[in-house]
Amino acid sequence: NDHPLTNFFKDDEKFIKFKNECTKTGTTEESIANAEKIGFKTNIKAVNPLDETKEVPVYFANFVLMDYGFGAVFGCPAHDQRDLDFAIKYKLEIIPVICPPGESENFKIDEEAYTGPGKIFNSKFLNDLKAPDESILKTIEIL
């Protein structure tokens, strides 16, 4: 199954090539985890639902499955390794939003995503909440 947005690109030669490349990869968790992360940048921008002043580019990617949720994800490259690998490859902005205990808010994400607990920052109304517990509850409340 393809995401409905693919219909807008069905005649785009670069998209067709991307889609054909994606079909070479299996759809099991293991095959997706081990596959090179590839993407197709659309001309679509999405508004960040937690910060309406920010727009983010919309990509099709080979590691997002239509059968999981809505077939779309809002990437968080600083805190998810697949998203980080993708962001590095496509030179996307990487903004940490969880500060590890004992670190300053100037810490950098390089090759490894930070997936541990900490304090939320760079997140406006979520700043200073504990991650993951308090921040998840507040985000659900807002959305």
For the regions a protein language model found, what residue spans apply to each?
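Residue patterns forming the tRNA-binding/recognition surfaces of aminoacyl-tRNA synthetases
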Residues: A72-L143
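NTP-handling and nucleic-acid-processing catalytic cores
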Residues: N1-I94, C99
